[in-house]
From Swiss-Prot:
This is Orotidine 5'-phosphate decarboxylase. PANTHER family: OROTIDINE 5'-PHOSPHATE DECARBOXYLASE. InterPro entries: Aldolase_TIM (IPR013785), OMPdecase_type-2 (IPR011995), OMPdeCOase_dom (IPR001754), RibuloseP-bd_barrel (IPR011060). The lineage of its organism: Bacteria, Pseudomonadati, Bacteroidota, Bacteroidia, Bacteroidales. Pathway: Pyrimidine metabolism; UMP biosynthesis via de novo pathway; UMP from orotate: step 2/2. Its EC number is 4.1.1.23.
């Protein structure tokens, strides 16, 4: 999916919501545990209920890898289900990969060739040669970690060099030498507030993947005020606040209702 297609889908749905599939078998409704594949059964129901209100899904690989082979199978089935039934949805593999060139090339092959996923999150710490293998696939996206929503982001990302440039700003500037706004996005946590204003001075045209709305307390209004650009430029993720909004047999219906609430907020902002 290219940038124009993504923007057109945002306009059509009046939404830039991404539903995070951080599926924990300890948190899904008990009645699903009787299913042959409880994780996939949960994901399928969530996807069917939320698809009208979102433009992307973001399975977090850690939740699937922690279950070994069964978890990876559930992940593959989830990706296939989205692609077959909701082909307009942008799929993000939240894997946070990043290693030396040969290893990164294998990661890229996994997500872009074997699974044909639209995008993957990548850690930039090891530099250009750890990122470029992901950039060799036409129509695929790298989503580079820039300024995250966790408290530990202060440990490194907000530290300044002798010129007063913060590390996340250096990541933004340097990585523009490797790619452009047609194949690279950045992760910026919703809890970072006014930092979006500084980020847009460096990357005015790139899409930003924004986790931290909902359970982590980020403000959608603040993110949009400082982060939105002429093509929207935002994919705002919500995971727990949607997928775990209810633990009864009505969990999917409630998840759909929560996604619809967020979509309505987004539509209001887009129409201002």
């Amino acid at each position: 999916m290219n940038k124009q297609q993504l923007f057109e889908n945002i306009q059509k749905k009046k939404s830039f919501l991404c539903v995070g599939l951080d599926t924990d078998i300890k948190k899904i409704p008990e009645h699903l545990l009787k299913e042959e594949d409880p994780i996939f059964a949960f994901n399928k129901a969530i996807i069917d209920a939320t698809a009208p209100y979102c433009i992307a899904y973001k399975p977090n690989l850690a939740f699937y890898e922690s279950m070994g082979v069964k978890g990876w199978i559930a992940f593959e089935k989830t990706v296939s289900y989205i692609k077959e039934n909701y082909p307009d949805q942008f799929i993000i593999a939240d894997a946070k990969r990043g290693d030396i060139g040969n290893t990164s090339a294998m990661y890229a092959r996994t997500f872009f060739e074997e699974l044909d996923i639209d995008s993957v999150t990548v850690a930039p710490y090891m530099g250009e040669d750890s990122v470029t293998p992901f950039l060799s696939y036409e129509g695929k996206w790298v989503i580079l970690l820039a300024l995250t929503s966790n408290k530990g982001s202060h440990d490194f990302q907000l530290t300044e060099d002798t010129n007063g440039e913060r590390l996340f700003e250096k990541v933004l500037r340097k990585s523009q030498e490797w790619a452009n706004d047609e194949n690279m996005m950045y992760v910026v946590g919703a809890t970072q507030g006014r930092a979006f204003e500084d980020i847009r001075k460096i990357v005015p045209n790139h899409f930003l993947l924004v986790p931290g709305i909902g359970a982590q307390g980020g403000s959608l209004e603040e993110v949009c005020k400082y982060g939105m650009n002429s093509t929207c430029g935002l994919i705002v993720n919500s995971s727990r606040a949607i997928i775990y909004a209810d633990k009864t047999e009505n969990f999917a219906t409630v998840a759909g209702q929560e996604a619809q609430k967020v979509q309505a907020q987004m539509e209001k902002i887009m129409c201002q």
